[in-house]
Every structure is written in C-alpha cells, then in structure tokens.
Amino acid sequence: MGINKLQAFLKGTHEAIIISSEENRRYFTGFPSTHGYLVVTKEEAVFFTDSRYIEAAQKTVKNCKAKLLTKVSEEIKEYIKDRKIIKIYSEREHITVSVSDYLKTAFLPCKVTPSKKL
C-alpha cells in the first residue's frame, strides 16, 4: 500500500492518517529513522522528524515533504489545526498503548481513532 492508497482510505478533506511505527514510516517514505511521524491527508503527505534526520530526510523521502519536528504536540497539532482536520486514523497493530494514548491527548480536540486497516 502506497501513500496514494492511504489517501484513498480517507473519506474527506477533514481526515488524516498518522503513521508512527518505524517500519511503516520507512515503507511509506523510503527513509529509515528511529523517530518521526508521517501525516497523510487527502491532498498531501508530510514526514515530521527531528533535527538528527531532517537534512537527510529532505533529500531522501519519496512521495511526501519533510518538516522539522521539535515538539509533537505543537508542530503536528498546528498542521492539523491549519487544515481543519477533525479525525485522525492511527495504526492499531504497530504502536504501543502508551503512544496511542499520547496521540489521543496531544491532538485534542481532534479525534484519534486506531484502525486495524493501517
């Protein structure tokens, strides 16, 4: 499944998918990293990563943009707010309960819904 198939999964412009697992980030972006989040909307995909990886990511990622991430609850939340996202699907099978709980609280009032289809 490529990024375009993730975009097809979304029902509308006010939905997004967040990919946080290392193996799925690498699969979708072509870039190996130990930290980062891939956010996919109907219109675009953005790989948020920290300062250790940003330069290499900007040169390497495929099918998406790379942006610097300093604090998850700020940059990604701002990205979500700017695009009026109200629902985010997250991985269900590939993340820990603590990461899932963190995403649910970090992006309030946006609803984060784990999906086993991802």
Question: Could you say what each language-model-derived stretch is?
Answer:
Residues 96-97:
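Domain-scale recognition of functional cores that engage charged ligands
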Residues 56-63:
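A short, polar/proline- and glycine-enriched secondary-structure boundary/capping micro-motif
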Residues 86-93:
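Acidic beta-strand-to-loop metal/phosphate-binding motif
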